């Protein structure tokens, strides 16, 4: 018996130590190692044991306090009124139990309860003190009793007023709220960090917490932080409204930001409707939330209900299903996207996350695999938010099994066996078999027949879908091998449509070298670059055999584009398809290099608008490109010339308003003469 009691006592102490460790990682180091759901499970396990064995209760247990101790780097601030956390509900039944506890304490209240309902922002709780309307101090929640002085950092947040917008400010007003970062701001912050080679943040909450705890306020000021107030602590020299909702509206009226989704809900069903609505809107809000906060609206009733040691009795956080969970990485497969991007896909032990069972998650690229230091067999943290593809955001390395296997990134495409290429400085590796890779086939063919490439009118996107799905076309060269009988077997393809398609294919065999190069779909080789390559090398053979150094001598061809071109030609599959295309009769006239004299249009940004009667728009564009012009599709202050044909519309009007040089078709032709 004694041994059993000893083991229970030991289990309780181990749980306390484990929870303290994770609190320190989360609150102090801003480096959470487990999902919130895992922490909640450990917390409730400890709480249940302490309730079952009260003789082992301890005032220092994680269940008896709000959070972790503050950092020693900041001055400490004692909260006059403790900043408590909230009890959690994870189901309707939990919420009903919360309501019953309230009703049992308010037996004299016979009307239905009214709640102030708010989204539960996933950020950092702060206290901001105003004296006579001036912001004088700000602190983190810390352990609920003592926080960290972050006044200088809070002053840098643009949506927090340094002076209240009222002519009659309170003598003292303590505003409590959540500092957070929008998803767009978070993505921009990480993108900038990547470009500078700096460490990125795992999620917006970590980014907000890390930004708010910077010792240098200038760094905080560069971060896109925001505040939403959720309550009031101290208030002196002011008569506050007698409901929570009205108090939030009053805060808003004096310049304090309040969340726009907050609603007043009368009765339990309306509260649950709010929960479901916010849950549905979650992915479109633009910021992270992990549930709703439901508060008794009447301040008098709040005071009657009071507090327990850790939380108010009049409020609860009804949390959404966990967006992060632990599971095992069983394997990694490599998928090929429509542009040839190679994406590692984690095959997971199925786990229920955010309302669905997840068995696959993206690992993004090889750099991400290295950053995570992940191996097959690892225990991983998988995250699913809204409609975003599940992803692995962390690894519990201490749980790595002895038989864990390293993840080997393939050197050849798993679909077509072409070489995989990765440009230095880029994260994404790509298959080089663009013309033959089945994974890229549809997009490669759609590009090949497009108007700016081979301009094959009779072959549209829907026809290509059918041709590929029925395995009738594998490469662009196969298009020219189609016959009428084959085409007429397809949906919505009668004799006339088949004839038109074949006629378009026959007509397209006569093209230009520039169009042909563009049609090959070499990554980074756009219409202008293709024309520059054709003009420079003059023949397909010279272009195919050009060295890396020779390619870089071409206008607009830098190191990256040159590498893309050499990767394309070094893949035997691509060379074979090009030879097949020539064998099918694709041809062009010798490249005529027009002499580019000094010309007012040379190197300028030009917009074509209206109908040109003496020259087709494509021909006009080709002339302009040979002059080194940038041909744009829209008019802006950066436009140098607008060439206006007949029936020119809004582009001509805008050019006139901006004072841009306007040329008629005849004036344009005169400059080319």
From Swiss-Prot:
One of its GO terms (cellular component) is cytosol. One of its GO terms (biological process) is DNA repair. The active site is at residue 120. Residues 596-673 form the BRCT domain. GO terms for molecular function: DNA binding; DNA ligase (NAD+) activity; metal ion binding. NAD(+) binds at residues 36-40, 85-86, 118, 141, 178, 295, 319. It holds the Pfam family HHH_2. CDD domains: BRCT_DNA_ligase_like, LIGANc. InterPro entries: BRCT_dom (IPR001357), BRCT_dom_sf (IPR036420), DisA/LigA_HHH (IPR041663), DNA_ligase (IPR001679), DNA_ligase_AS (IPR018239), DNA_ligase_CS (IPR033136), DNAligase_adenylation (IPR013839), DNAligase_N (IPR013840). PROSITE patterns: BRCT, DNA_LIGASE_N1, DNA_LIGASE_N2. It catalyses: NAD(+) + (deoxyribonucleotide)n-3'-hydroxyl + 5'-phospho-(deoxyribonucleotide)m = (deoxyribonucleotide)n+m + AMP + beta-nicotinamide D-nucleotide. It is an enzyme of class 6 (ligase). Its EC number is 6.5.1.2. Belongs to the NAD-dependent DNA ligase family. LigA subfamily. This is DNA ligase. It comes from Histophilus somni (strain 129Pt). The gene is ligA.
């Amino acid at each position: 018996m004694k041994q059993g009691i000893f083991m229970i006592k030991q289990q309780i102490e181990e749980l306390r130590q484990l929870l303290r460790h994770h609190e320190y990682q989360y609150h102090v180091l801003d480096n959470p190692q487990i999902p919130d759901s895992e922490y909640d499970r450990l917390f409730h396990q400890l709480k249940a044991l302490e309730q079952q064995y009260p003789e082992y209760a301890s005032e220092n247990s994680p269940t008896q306090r709000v959070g972790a101790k503050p950092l020693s780097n900041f001055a400490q601030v004692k909260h006059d009124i403790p900043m408590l956390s909230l009890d959690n509900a994870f189901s309707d039944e939990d919420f009903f139990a919360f309501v019953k506890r309230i009703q049992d304490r308010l037996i004299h209240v016979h009307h239905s309860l009214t709640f102030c309902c708010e989204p539960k922002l996933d950020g950092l709780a702060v206290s901001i003190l105003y004296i006579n309307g001036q912001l004088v101090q700000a602190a983190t929640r810390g352990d609920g009793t003592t926080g960290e002085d972050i006044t200088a950092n809070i002053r840098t947040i643009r949506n927090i007023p340094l002076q209240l917008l009222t002519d009659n400010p309170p003598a003292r007003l303590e505003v409590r709220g959540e500092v957070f970062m929008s998803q767009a701001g978070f993505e921009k912050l990480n993108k900038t960090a990547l470009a500078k080679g700096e460490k990125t943040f795992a999620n917006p909450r970590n980014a907000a917490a890390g930004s708010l705890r910077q010792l240098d306020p200038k760094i905080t000021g560069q971060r896109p932080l925001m505040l939403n107030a959720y309550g009031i602590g101290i208030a002196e020299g002011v008569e506050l409204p007698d409901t929570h909702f009205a108090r939030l509206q009053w805060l808003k009226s004096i310049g304090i930001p309040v969340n726009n989704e907050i609603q007043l809900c009368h009765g339990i069903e309306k509260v649950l409707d709010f929960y479901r609505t916010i849950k549905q809107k979650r992915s479109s809000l633009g910021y992270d939330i992990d549930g709703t906060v439901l508060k008794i609206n009447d301040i008098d009733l709040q005071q009657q209900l009071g507090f327990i040691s850790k939380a108010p009795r009049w409020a609860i956080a009804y949390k959404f299903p966990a967006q992060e969970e632990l599971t095992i990485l069983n394997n990694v497969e490599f998928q090929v996207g429509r542009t040839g991007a190679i994406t590692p896909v984690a095959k997971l032990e199925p786990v229920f996350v955010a309302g669905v069972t997840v068995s696959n998650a993206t690992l993004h690229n090889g750099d991400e695999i290295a950053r995570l230091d992940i191996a097959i067999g690892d225990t991983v943290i998988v995250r699913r938010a809204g409609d975003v593809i599940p992803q692995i955001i962390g690894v519990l390395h201490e749980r790595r099994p002895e038989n864990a296997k390293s993840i080997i990134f393939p050197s050849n495409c798993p679909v077509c066996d072409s070489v995989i290429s990765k440009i230095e400085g880029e994260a994404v590796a790509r298959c080089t078999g663009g013309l033959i890779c089945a994974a890229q086939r549809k997009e490669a063919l759609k590009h090949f027949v497009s108007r700016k490439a081979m301009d094959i009118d009779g072959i549209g996107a829907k026809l290509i879908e059918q041709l590929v799905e029925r395995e009738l076309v594998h490469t662009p060269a196969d298009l020219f091998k189609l016959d009428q009988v084959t085409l007429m077997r397809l949906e919505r393809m009668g004799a006339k449509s088949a004839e038109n398609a074949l006629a378009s294919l026959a007509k397209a065999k006569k093209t230009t070298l520039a169009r042909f190069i563009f049609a090959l779909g070499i990554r980074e080789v756009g219409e202008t670059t293709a024309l520059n390559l054709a003009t420079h090398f003059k023949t397909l053979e010279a272009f195919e055999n050009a060295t890396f150094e020779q390619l870089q001598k071409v206008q607009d061809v830098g190191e990256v584009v040159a590498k893309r071109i050499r990767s394309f030609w070094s893949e035997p599959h691509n060379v074979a398809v090009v030879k097949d295309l020539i064998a099918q009769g694709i041809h062009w006239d010798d490249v005529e290099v027009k002499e580019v004299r000094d010309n007012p249009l040379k190197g300028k940004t030009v917009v074509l608008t209206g109908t040109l009667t003496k020259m087709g728009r494509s021909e006009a564009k080709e002339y302009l490109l040979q002059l080194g012009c940038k041909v744009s599709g829209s008019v802006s202050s950066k436009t140098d010339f607008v060439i206006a044909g007949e029936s020119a519309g809004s582009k001509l009007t805008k050019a006139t308003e901006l004072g841009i040089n306007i040329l008629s078709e005849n004036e344009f032709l005169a400059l080319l003469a």
